[in-house]
Amino acid sequence: MKPQLSPKAIREIREGTCNPLGAPQVTTDLSENIILTSLDDLHNWARLSSLWPLLYGTACCFIEFAALIGSRFDFDRFGLVPRSSPRQADLLIVAGTVTMKMAPALVRLYEQMPEPKYVIAMGACTITGGMFSADSTTAVRGVDKLIPVDLYLPGCPPRPEAIFDAVIKLRKKVGNESILERTKTEQTHRYITSDHEMNLVFSENTGEYLNKTSANVIPPSKKEKITELPENTEKTEIINSVED
């Protein structure tokens, strides 16, 4: 009678004949090399270190943000790459006073940015109008009246360290978002600002004054008579100037 082989011996014989290198073995280290996550977390993780800001500086607050570009603070380590086109940016940093004439341009830039997009209101003049909110008729009292703001950064002006803190808090918000929240740009919480007390004034440039011919025509009695020079006067003056 042939001796019976154990299952372990049979497995070793098969491994030696079928696969000389041996069968793959699952080790305990494999569980440490697999990350289980959702599509939201993967998408948010990829965007955390790739926020491309569009710099919209209108006043002195932007000088503090310009200090971040230097080697002392080095904002490149956060993945911030300034863009000059709103179609390539996903973060709008508004730094400085926003006037009534610049408001349409700001809204147009925000609308040209692709989704998802975020806004940081930097400085007191951007958030509430600052010192211009009391009696100025040209300053916007809060940029959140024009576009939705995700993060308020108060200060006059804020320090570069405060800007870093704002970017870190914005990254936390981005990391906790879901797919359904990316399309919602409505702002739920707004900064307390004073409303504009202005009256609607129609434009005076209607063109009606051009149709009033009586206002443009000078009466004949008030017209001054033009004194005509003799014909030989100009010729004699030219001849005398040439001879001299």
Swiss-Prot record:
GO terms for biological process: aerobic respiration; electron transport coupled proton transport; photosynthesis, light reaction. Its cofactor is [4Fe-4S] cluster. Binds 1 [4Fe-4S] cluster. SUPFAM superfamilies: HydA/Nqo6-like. The keyword Thylakoid applies. It is an enzyme of class 7 (translocase). It is found in: Cellular thylakoid membrane. It is a peripheral membrane protein. Keywords: 4Fe-4S, Iron, Iron-sulfur, Membrane, Metal-binding, NAD, NADP, Plastoquinone, Quinone, Thylakoid, Translocase, Transport. Its EC number is 7.1.1.-. It catalyses: a plastoquinone + NADH + (n+1) H(+)(in) = a plastoquinol + NAD(+) + n H(+)(out); a plastoquinone + NADPH + (n+1) H(+)(in) = a plastoquinol + NADP(+) + n H(+)(out). GO terms for cellular component: plasma membrane-derived thylakoid membrane; respiratory chain complex I. Its main location: membrane. The keyword 4Fe-4S applies. [4Fe-4S] cluster binds at C60, C61, C125, C156. GO terms for molecular function: 4 iron, 4 sulfur cluster binding; iron ion binding; NADH dehydrogenase (ubiquinone) activity; quinone binding. NDH-1 shuttles electrons from an unknown electron donor, via FMN and iron-sulfur (Fe-S) centers, to quinones in the respiratory and/or the photosynthetic chain. The immediate electron acceptor for the enzyme in this species is believed to be plastoquinone. Couples the redox reaction to proton translocation, and thus conserves the redox energy in a proton gradient. Cyanobacterial NDH-1 also plays a role in inorganic carbon-concentration. NDH-1 can be composed of about 15 different subunits; different subcomplexes with different compositions have been identified which probably have different functions. Belongs to the complex I 20 kDa subunit family. PANTHER family: NADH DEHYDROGENASE, NADH DEHYDROGENASE [UBIQUINONE] IRON-SULFUR PROTEIN 7, MITOCHONDRIAL. This is NAD(P)H-quinone oxidoreductase subunit K. It comes from Prochlorococcus marinus (strain AS9601).
